[in-house]
Regions:
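CBM-like, beta-strand-rich accessory domains located in the C-terminal region of large
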Residues: 215, 373-374, 380-385, 402-421, ...
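Carbohydrate-active enzyme catalytic cores, enriched for enzymes
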Residues: 312, 316-500, 555-558
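Aromatic-lined, polymer-binding surfaces characteristic
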Residues: 137-361, 366, 374
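Membrane-proximal basic amphipathic "stem/tether" segments
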Residues: 1-62
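Beta-strand-rich N-terminal accessory domains
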Residues: 54, 58, 62, 66-70, ...
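Residues that flank catalytic or metal-binding motifs in active/ligand-binding sites
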Residues: 165, 271, 353, 454-456, ...
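Beta-sandwich/jelly-roll carbohydrate-recognition scaffolds of carbohydrate-active enzymes
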Residues: 134, 446-448, 456, 595-596, ...
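Acidic/polar, glycine-enriched structural segments that form the non-catalytic walls/loops
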Residues: 40, 45-48, 52-55, 60, ...
């Protein structure tokens, strides 16, 4: 089989002949480029920083003086004016400052800090072991980066060691130094940089395997470099070593761009953002101008490709929407403060991305974890849980002077989302003036029902009531990667509690069984037929998912007193006896309940399971009257899920009535963390066509259940009679 035929076989989705040919040629070029890179490893490590001629010929002391005195380029205002920012940090955020300094102390003295959802980890008391997975204790080899197999099936997880090697903890050290002027912090910074360089020769090992990781590491190093530049510990030798490291990072990204003519993703976006940042902030490097121009051009082209018309990320993932929004937003701000023009069209697209976040945040201020999430952040000024997206709203509120975005950073009760302050990033990215601008924003209107038709996301909400319908495809124009088997799945929040939730992701390659479990149909609040997956999944391929479901929205009718959305998917059409699933969701805003109707059409007899995945920490029981009751013991709120028999079955006890059970599950709100949860399942073996209807009725703490249940059921029955 020739390389063209091989490429055609492995490319997923519809690929025309021209695109397949271009991709074939690109892959041939990659093969040749890697041969050259492999042959030049020694030279790549020995080569000094390639400086522009006017900087290459000056003395090292003059070069250091130049960096300390230069006015342009500028990093983010909070970093650039670190003394002012540090004073504001102490005065405005005293509790956060205490935590920051405590974290910096642990990082410097014991090499310990939080790692994703795994909690605090220590990485070597004497010297950090940069290539050791701190969970499995596997030592990644220093093989040529492209030879490393990331799928080992031994519990090791490249994502974990990559997080360590993004070096974001060095930004914590730098912020603490800005506040304390403690010279032990820059000493620790330089020791860790020297240690990292010694253990990670260029293009060798897992930490050079993925250009995205190289780019994110460079971004964090630029932030730390800005904060430590004024330290006496920054001498001529240290500067020379850092410039060499930045040049190596930029050159490696350029040699190993994660581009494809078929589809690009967050990886390529991070690659080009990394080149843009290095190019903007280090014009002294000979390659900087080319990196800056290429990075900006590609960044904007990727916004055209990867951001849908309604502002949503095209990878069918709210987690990667957050990451991409950070990449675009921070890059746009960096360009703006350095006089680099970005067309208004792209600022409008950026605003649309922020609008999407504002719409999908639940009343508790948390994000629904649709699709994959690895908890990734660009500059983790504060390490945020995977479902914490409110801080990007704070940045968006200030940039676009939009009070609605500011209102979205708080819960419906006026508290910070999850009790975590959202202004830290504001202060360090936009500076003290940005924080003042944010604080001056007043006035807003409550969020309302909203459709994101391109993304396939529909939000039916009023006051404390929130239901999200997911009618998205598997992502990347149907090619899949970070999508889940969640077609027509729902999320429900009411009375200040998230009741029905997406399960999240948990882990990727560390455990393929859990990886597939968390993205399975059975783990989502939708209907499963004959135990089949909505989209095909390959057990050995954790980042491939089919697009057989192809959800289609039939109707969307928002209104003052009621909302309606109707959608269907075709994932079960590939069964021996094909089945189509149509879901209709009605939101009665007056009587405060939702009615969900599932219609299964086709031929033959099938096993059908209607599930809702419930949030952890709730008490769930099946009552004697058949109602599933979900209770939040903390605030007294309950959610009642009532199976409504079709009109012709009311009052009857029939052989194929639904059996209700509670199934043990897990939920993950952060990469690497999981908690026990429950799914309620109504199952039946029945001939098709078949329909089932469920009334979802919230009862807040001070409400009378009998009155709420009676009025909602009467209204639901009336609605069913009309249908």
């Amino acid at each position: 089989m020739n390389i063209y035929s091989k490429a055609k076989r492995v490319l997923r989705g519809d690929v025309n002949a021209r695109t397949a040919a271009l991709e074939t040629m690109r892959r041939l070029r990659v093969i040749r480029a890697r041969r050259r890179e492999r042959a030049e490893l020694a030279e790549l490590n020995q080569q000094p920083a390639r400086l522009r001629e006017e900087f290459a010929r000056i003395r090292a002391s003059d070069l250091l003086a130049h960096f300390r005195s230069r006015i342009q380029p500028k990093f983010f205002p909070g970093f650039q004016d670190a003394t002012v920012t540090a004073q504001a940090q102490r005065q405005i955020f005293p509790d956060e400052t205490v935590r920051l300094l405590s974290q910096a102390k642990r990082i410097g003295e014991e090499h310990c800090w939080p790692l994703l959802g795994f909690g605090e980890r220590c990485f070597g008391r004497e010297e950090i072991l940069w290539n050791r997975d701190p969970l499995s204790m596997f030592d990644w080899p220093l093989d040529y980066h492209a030879d490393i197999n990331l799928m080992r099936n031994d519990g090791s997880d490249a994502r974990v060691v990559w997080e360590l090697n993004r070096l974001s903890h060095l930004v914590t050290l730098g912020r603490a130094y800005a506040i304390t002027n403690d010279e032990k912090l820059p000493v620790q910074f330089w020791q860790q940089i020297a240690s990292w360089r010694a253990q990670n020769p260029v293009a060798c090992g897992v930490n050079w395997n993925c250009a995205m990781e190289v780019a994110l590491r460079a971004m964090n190093l630029l932030a730390a470099f800005t904060l430590f530049l004024r330290s006496p510990q920054m001498n001529e030798v240290a500067l020379k070593d850092l410039l060499k490291l930045f040049d190596q990072h930029g050159a490696h990204i350029q040699r190993n761009l994660e581009f494809s003519h078929v589809a690009t993703s967050n990886h390529y976006l991070a690659d080009v953002a990394g080149l843009l940042w290095i190019g903007v902030m280090l014009p002294e490097l000979a390659a900087a101008e080319g990196w800056r121009e290429f990075g900006l051009r590609e960044l904007l082209q990727e916004m055209d490709k990867q951001v849908l018309a309604d502002g949503a990320d095209y990878e069918a993932s709210t987690g990667y929407h957050r990451l991409k929004l950070e990449l675009f937003l921070y890059s746009f701000v960096l360009c703006h403060i350095n006089g680099i023009d970005i067309a208004e069209k792209y600022w409008s697209n950026l605003r649309a991305m922020v609008e999407y976040v504002c719409a999908y945040l639940r009343p508790d201020g948390r994000a629904p974890l649709i699709g994959d999430s690895d908890s990734g952040q660009v500059l983790p000024i504060v390490r945020r849980r995977a479902d914490d997206h409110a801080y990007v709203l704070a940045l968006g509120a200030t940039i676009f002077q939009e009070p609605r975005f500011k209102a979205g950073t708080h819960t419906s009760g006026g508290q910070y989302a999850g009790g975590v302050r959202t202004e830290d990033e504001l202060l360090w990215i936009l500076g003290e003036q940005g924080l003042r601008d944010y604080q001056a924003l007043t006035g807003s209107r409550p969020p309302s029902s909203q459709a994101f038709s391109d993304a396939g996301i529909f939000i039916l909400r009023k006051d404390d009531l929130y239901l999200l319908v997911n009618a998205s495809d598997s992502g990347v124009n149907g090619r899949g990667s970070h999508g889940h088997n969640d077609a027509l799945s729902i999320e429900v929040s009411a009375c200040g509690t998230a009741f029905i939730v997406d399960p999240g992701s948990f882990v990727y390659t560390a455990d393929l069984s859990d990886r597939h479990l968390f993205r399975s149909t059975a783990y989502h609040s939708t209907v499963q037929v004959d135990s089949a997956e909505q989209n095909s999944i390959e057990e050995a391929a954790p980042f491939i998912i089919g697009n057989e479901a192809r959800p289609q929205v039939i109707n969307w009718e928002p209104g003052e007193t009621a909302d309606l959305v109707v959608a269907e998917h075709y994932g079960y059409r590939r069964l021996a006896q094909p089945v189509t699933h149509r879901r209709t969701v009605r939101f009665n805003k007056t009587d405060r309940y939702w009615l969900v109707e599932d219609q299964l059409t086709g031929e033959g007899t099938h096993e059908c399971a209607f599930r809702v995945h419930l949030a952890p920490g709730l008490e769930t029981r099946i009552r004697s009257d058949g109602i599933v009751e979900v209770c939040d013991k903390i605030n007294g709120a309950r959610l009642l899920i009532v199976y409504q028999k079709p009109d012709h079955q009311r009052g009857q006890s029939i052989a194929n009535d639904l059996e209700t059970t509670l199934e043990p599950r897990f939920s993950s709100n952060d990469y690497g963390a999981k908690e026990p949860s429950t799914s309620a399942c109504w199952s039946v073996r029945t001939a098709l066509p078949y329909s089932a209807q469920f009334a979802i009725i919230p009862v807040c703490a001070k409400e009378n259940e009998r009155e709420r249940l009676g009025s909602a059921i009467d209204s639901a029955n009336s609605q069913m009679d009309k249908n």
